[in-house]
Swiss-Prot record:
It comes from Thermococcus kodakarensis (strain ATCC BAA-918 / JCM 12380 / KOD1). This is Signal recognition particle 19 kDa protein. The gene is srp19. NCBIfam families: PRK03745.1 (NF002993). One of its GO terms (biological process) is SRP-dependent cotranslational protein targeting to membrane. Keywords: Cytoplasm, Ribonucleoprotein, RNA-binding, Signal recognition particle. Belongs to the SRP19 family. GO terms for cellular component: signal recognition particle. GO terms for molecular function: 7S RNA binding. Involved in targeting and insertion of nascent membrane proteins into the cytoplasmic membrane. Binds directly to 7S RNA and mediates binding of the 54 kDa subunit of the SRP.
Length: 108
């Protein structure tokens, strides 16, 4: 299945009115297009198109700080909803690993 993914679809700071598609408990704070791309590729999904500067038209009416730029066209064997939940879970794992690695470096 091919579909478009906007970072706003998995951003916990946004209400569903502005395009969040996953539950707030599953969503992430301020996901970046690069994080989404990396997570999708690790999960075996194919990123067909990647436009980090594109803005979701739904976000034109909200505060600048909540506007998350980026658009990805992804091909996945799973439906969009399941793919988004998997991507959120993988980004959460990657962020935890990054924090853990960063924390280890500080201890000397």
């Amino acid at each position: 299945m091919k579909f478009v993914v906007w970072p706003s679809e998995i951003d916990s700071r946004l209400p569903r009115k502005y395009g969040r598609l996953v539950k707030k408990e599953v969503a992430l704070e301020a996901p970046t297009p690069e994080e989404i791309r990396d997570a999708a590729e690790i999960l075996g999904m194919k990123v067909i198109e990647f436009e980090p500067e594109k803005l979701n038209p739904r976000l034109s009416g909200i505060d600048e700080e909540l506007r998350t730029k980026g658009m990805l066209r992804i091909e996945s064997p799973y439906p969009k909803g399941k793919s988004l939940r998997m991507i959120c879970e993988k980004i959460r794992e990657l962020r935890a690993k990054k924090r853990k690695a960063h924390g280890k470096r500080k201890k000397r």
